[in-house]
A protein has these predicted regions:
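C-terminal "cap" of GNAT-fold acetyltransferases
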Residues: 148-192
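Anionic, Ser/Thr-rich low-complexity intrinsically disordered regions
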Residues: 62, 120, 150-152
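Conserved active-site alpha-helix within GNAT-family acetyltransferase domains
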Residues: 125-145
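Conserved acetyl-CoA-binding loop-helix of GNAT-fold acetyltransferases
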Residues: 86-112, 132-136
């Protein structure tokens, strides 16, 4: 689904040198926008795409392409090959919602690479607007997974669903996970 951007809007990739603008956009919308966390996203090979109106960033999302997706809620590191893309953390500023801007932005995003791609995304089941937008983009739900964390080192979690690239970390075949100190340190280093 590709929708045109409105007049005065421009689709662009936000590079590491644009991090201060991203921090400002996050904070202007009530999010922490921690520079060190955004830096880790770039360090882990993630790419950020946005829509700009004038000098203002009004929407953005992150894409992982050929780099692993770490789902810290499950302690799963999911490898992605060169034909797989994980889209995450899409955001549209409140005053621009309801204008199908997310669809236009994602439509522009899928044209960035010429290689045929398989797209993945994760959405909270309580985020109905995002679920509707994902459905409009052609995504379909293939699994619902759950996790519960106890303290800093123990998880109860679903097993990875079939159809998802098989997670490589941390012991994805175990529903009950208790991490060692080294695993906890590794886990924290992956969160971005």
């Amino acid at each position: 689904c590709q929708l045109p951007l409105a007049e005065g809007q421009r689709f662009l990739e936000m590079h590491e040198s644009d991090k201060a603008r991203l921090v400002q956009a996050y904070r202007a919308n009530g999010m922490s926008g921690k520079p060190e966390r955004l830096q880790r996203r770039y360090d882990h090979g993630r790419r950020c795409f946005a829509i700009e109106e004038g000098e203002r960033i009004v929407a953005w999302f992150w894409a992982l392409h050929g780099v692993p997706r770490y789902m810290d809620e499950f302690a799963w590191q999911i490898p992605l090959n060169e034909t797989q893309v994980w889209l995450r953390d899409a955001f549209v500023v409140p005053e621009r919602r309801g204008r199908r801007l997310l669809l236009a932005m994602m439509g522009a995003g899928v044209t960035v690479e010429s290689t045929p791609m398989e797209y993945f995304s994760d959405v909270s089941v309580s985020n109905r607007p995002s679920l509707r937008a994902h459905a409009a983009m052609g995504f379909s739900r293939f699994a619902t997974v759950h996790s519960l964390r106890f303290g800093g080192s123990r998880w109860w979690r679903s097993l990875p669903p079939e159809g998802l690239p098989a997670p490589a970390q941390l012991r994805p075949d175990q529903k009950h996970l208790r991490m060692s100190a080294d695993e906890i340190a590794w886990h924290h280093a992956q969160i971005a």
